Amino acid sequence: MFSPFLKPAALATILLLIAGTASAQSRELRVCADPDNMPFSNIQQRGFENRIAELVARDLGAHLTYVWQRMGRGFVREYIDKSQCDLVIGVPANFRPLLTTIPYYRSSYVFVVPRQSNVKSVSLDSPELHGLKIGVQVLDENYTPPGTALARRGLQNEIVGFDTTGEDAESIVRAVAKHQVDLAVVWGPLAGYFARRYRGALKLMPVEPEVDPPGLPFTFAISMGVRKGNTALRNDLQNVLSTHSSQIHDILAEYGVPELPLAPQQTSISRGQ
């Protein structure tokens, strides 16, 4: 309660402090997230991207809210560009439809192989892949990069496609564990998270080469993305990523995300457009 005996200067200082506190508390961070996409996010907020979003909001003193939407074709236009949400926690670095932060982790596709398998080392060019059943992820009826690379090598008949969205996310890893396929090529964060459920029965090996000529990548650096032109929020996010890098990597490790080193230039903060 205000005292009637406060001097005007003191009263003005208190009012400014209250106004600043109210402004910080009123800031809202609206995150676009998939409601059923573990280990990344879900509506129960148990994914690692949910955890990272909480860390960001806490650092910014913002109230975290979610706009739940499957990250399909057109979501940037409908949700980010139309200001229904402010931020996507995980997009490829330099994702053109958005203004992206510095990357905060880098991962790769991995081979998921039974630990007792005769396959000791494997690459996309391994002759022993011929005649095996090879699981690959299918996205919107299209192959992910591993499927495309295998098809280029004449291995179309060996490919077994898996929809890994929603409740089927674990299906491709489970198929390896249950010997329904001989091995699978899976995006690292998904593979690492679900492989742990099989208590050492599976091993993960990075896909080689990292880039399939002439230019099909198997490793990706991951950034946060905001609406183009929103440099203020992008810069705030980059400060959070730099300040809390070790905490973010701890979260990723907790979820079994296989990480690769970021290139030094990828960790340099840019303040431009």
Q: Predicted regions span which residues?
A:
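Bacterial N-terminal signal peptides that target proteins for export
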Residues: M1-L11
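Periplasmic-binding protein-like
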Residues: D34-N37, R106-V110, N118, Y198-L241, ...
